[in-house]
Swiss-Prot record:
Homohexamer. It is found in: Cytoplasm. Substrate binds at residues 9, 41, 73, 87. The keyword Cytoplasm applies. This is Phosphopantetheine adenylyltransferase. It catalyses: (R)-4'-phosphopantetheine + ATP + H(+) = 3'-dephospho-CoA + diphosphate. HAMAP family: PPAT_bact. Reversibly transfers an adenylyl group from ATP to 4'-phosphopantetheine, yielding dephospho-CoA (dPCoA) and pyrophosphate. The keyword Secreted does not apply. Pathway: Cofactor biosynthesis; coenzyme A biosynthesis; CoA from (R)-pantothenate: step 4/5.
Length: 150
């Protein structure tokens, strides 16, 4: 079974994240959405809420699991028996950062990272922008997957 983790903070989960998951399902048997707990980040939604929102959204998709983790991503990948890490790339800056991390992960754990480039119409979508809009009580429905409850 080909299993990948898709790690992130997902604060909140956006249509960009959704796109990466859907595209990953075309070449993986299972995707584990790993929601990292990072004590250095101030999040809008608590970890429990993010896990709940994403699990509820994917409740009818048996090939998707949702878990939180508070260790190195490569250790989480081992815990869930994933052979791959999938990351979404929006910009050249994202690529340069992810390429470095992918090299380190390969050297430390022998795990491969698959970089998926964002569809052009989604490059402006980020959790940061969505959080800012939420802070101003703006409608965010165009930036989150249809059917996702906040």
């Amino acid at each position: 079974m080909r299993r990948a983790i898709f790690p992130g903070t997902f604060d909140p989960f956006t249509i960009g994240h959704y796109s990466v998951v859907q595209r990953t399902l075309t070449f993986m048997d299972e995707v584990v959405i790993g929601i990292g707990i990072n004590e250095n980040k101030n999040t809008y939604f608590p970890i429990e809420k993010r896990v709940e929102m994403i699990r509820k959204f994917y409740k009818d998709e048996p090939r998707i699991k949702v878990e939180s983790y508070d260790c190195l991503t490569i250790d989480f990948a081992r815990q869930v028996d994933a052979q791959f890490i999938v990351r979404g790339i929006r910009t050249v800056k994202d690529f340069e950062y992810e390429e470095t991390i992918a090299d380190i992960n390969r050297k430390l754990a022998g795990i491969e990272t698959i970089l998926l480039f964002t569809e052009p119409e989604l490059t402006c979508v980020s959790s940061t922008i969505v959080r800012e809009l939420l802070g101003y009580n703006k409608d965010i429905s165009m930036f989150i997957p249809k059917g996702m409850e906040m």
